[in-house]
Amino acid sequence: PTLSPALAGLIGMTAGLLLALAVVLLLHQLDDTIRRLDDLQAALDIPALAALAALDGESPAQRVVMLHAPLSPAGEGYRVLRTNLQFSAVARPLHTLLITSAGPAEGKSTTAANLALALAQAGRRVILVDADLRRPSQHRLFGKPNNLGLSAALLHPTRPLPDFVCESGVSGLSLLLAGPLPPNPAELLASRRMQQIVADLAAAADVVIFDTPPTLIAADALILAAQMDGTILVADQGRTRRVLAQQALARLVAVRARLLGAVLNRDTSQRGYDSPVYAEAAAPALTSPARRRLWWRIKPVA
């Protein structure tokens, strides 16, 4: 018997819905990206330190949330990260910290900038180093010229290091920007001069944070990670693939980096918290008061 037009339409609609559902399920099964904090911890088997809320935009003012909107959900995420790092430093002091990611545009520079601000706001003396000598971004985030910085300090070892450091405009936070891009960043970062710079910075501040290139893009992060007290791997929700995050982790492990944990960036589930207050007062300081040194007289970069 011939089907009525209405019944034929119903069958066609049902078949279309089933096909669409099958496609959605297939895409979900094929999706290898990290989407939740527990995904991140399961994929890497290292502590998940914080989930950072998605920001409202990509302008410098919107990205540096700890400066412009510190009480927002995103700002709360950086305070949680700060607190968890303080507890990580109980057994071993944390003076030098490296921030990296598996691939580009996953939030490592934004994370480094906001974590540096969060630590400075808690009374720490912090130096933020833009060690990404390939695609630096800290000068844009803080609205500073990039005509002087780490690359110049590496190429002019006889000049005092404070000549290359500038003020951030925030109490407790100084910046060593990337400076002009060199033709051989990996060689410069692997030099003895860089080792001396790391030691001098660590002696002059409570915490020194290094923003480095992605681990799977260049060897730069691996060169520095071996010298650091701790390393954090940033993953971007819905962008970072599990297999690539695992490859980045394996490379860091191979150079014996001290991995403190991972951070999930742009987490769209982080819209707020049941309690805005965390036990930061009970968290131990990253360094003892005796650690603090007489800071250099910093000259703003013109």
Residue map of PLM features:
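Gly/Ser-rich helix-loop-strand patches that form or flank binding pockets
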Residues: A43-A48, A226-L233
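Short boundary/hinge segments that flank catalytic cores
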Residues: G9-R125, A131-S151, P183-A186, R192, ...
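Membrane-interface helix-start motif
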Residues: P1-G9
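Residue-level preference for the first positions of well-ordered beta-strands
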Residues: T96-L98, R125-I127, L173-L175, V207-I209
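Phosphate-binding/switch loop-helix module in NTP-utilizing enzymes
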Residues: L85-S88, A178-A218, A225
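Conserved Switch II/interswitch segment of TRAFAC-class P-loop GTPases
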Residues: T212-I217, M228-Q246
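Nucleotide-state-sensitive switch-loop elements of NTP-binding domains
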Residues: A152-L181
